Amino acid sequence: KIIEVITAQDLEAKKGQNLANVLSQVAGVEINGNQSFSGKNLGYYIRGGRNRQVAIYIDGVPVTDASGINLEYDLRLIPVEQIEKIEVMKGASSTLYGTGAATGVINITLKKSVKKEISGNAYINMGTQNTSETSKTSAQDFNQGVSLNGTINKVSYMTTLNSTETKGMSEAAGEDFEEDTFSRVNVLQKIGFKANDQLSFEFFGNYDRIKNTFDNSFDGFIANSDDLNN
């Protein structure tokens, strides 16, 4: 069994990348689809096992995505800026994590609240894939967010708001199709209460709102422009 650790300092050098991009650079880990258009399903492969054999934990809590048919969690949903550490365990880990960890575990630790009453930061990332050279669109990516955290007496808190917009390009053939745009709003909140040195409580919540557009799927079907863009 091999454990590889990605620290906050490592993530600092990878600004502008999503979590799927970061993990795909780990030896022995393949994230199928991490370079595809936003909103596409991802495939996680560790030592030959795929999604259902790879467990994903955030602060020790197993996560799934109820919006998908297979309940698999999309690693692009969590902002990299809010991650303190990632542990990638390569190898069978069912004894510790159950049957969902037959070939590996991705264990994500979020940043903790600072000791002062309030602290915050804001960020914005912009980029392009230079697709304007071959297409009428430049497929710009915009990612921005703000975070507030602190500790007041025995209560700690962290609240982050992140939004992502991608002016994607159409996967359909032809020139009459609009870009397949993608937008996401993410709100992440942690609240902790330290009763004493031996007892503490922590509550974690995550909300995502996603809007994704796609083209008509009929090949060779002639329709009006409104139908083509729905």
Name these PLM-found stretches.
Residues 69, 88-89, 123-131, 142, ...:
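Extracytoplasmic loops and strand-loop junctions of Gram-negative outer membrane beta-barrel proteins
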Residues 31, 53, 63-65, 92-96, ...:
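Short beta-strands and strand-coil junctions in structured, solvent-facing domains, enriched
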Residues 81-84, 95-107, 112-172, 180-187, ...:
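Outer-membrane beta-barrel translocator/receptor signature
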Residues 166-186, 194, 198-230:
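Flexible loop and strand-edge segments within Gram-negative outer membrane beta-barrel domains
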